[in-house]
Amino acid sequence: HEGYSSKAYKLGDGMITIGWGHAEPVSKSRYKVGEEISKIEANELLKMDLKKAADGVRRMFKQWEDEGKKVLITQDMFDSLVSIAFNAGVSGLRNSEIVKKMKMGEYEEAGELIKKFKTSNKFSGLSKRREKESKTFLSFLD
């Protein structure tokens, strides 16, 4: 959503970002600010990051299943949740009000909460991303 950057940069949140949004803590990053990578390497990082996010969302739903909770999940909902987990981390999603609403069966409310999830006026690209994720999540209402 935010685009591609061949050069590593700091976002101001203690993370270094590079490629299609791959983020690492500054203190543990293998990349230095200004260091460049190829699109091929960026694509590999994206695949790895998306797999990690998707696996985390799947584990979350598996845990709910194991607890006996029946939760509706469409492909569009899953895709939106993976996008959020990619951007904010699986733990950030797991502990969110979005997930609490889903567990209660309040899917429309969960979808609306996506719009406000970890956004600020500082990052307008993130607000646009959350709008798209919310719309995708709520597509089951159409």
Q: Where are the predicted features?
A:
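Catalytic nucleotidyl-transfer cores of nucleotide-processing enzymes
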Residues: 1-13
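Long, amphipathic alpha-helical surface segments
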Residues: 1-4, 37, 43-54, 90-142
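Extracellular/periplasmic catalytic domains that process cell-envelope and extracellular macromolecules
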Residues: 9-12, 73-77
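Substrate-binding/active-site groove segments that recognize
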Residues: 10-34
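Residue-level detector of buried hydrophobic side-chain packing
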Residues: 18, 81-82, 110, 133
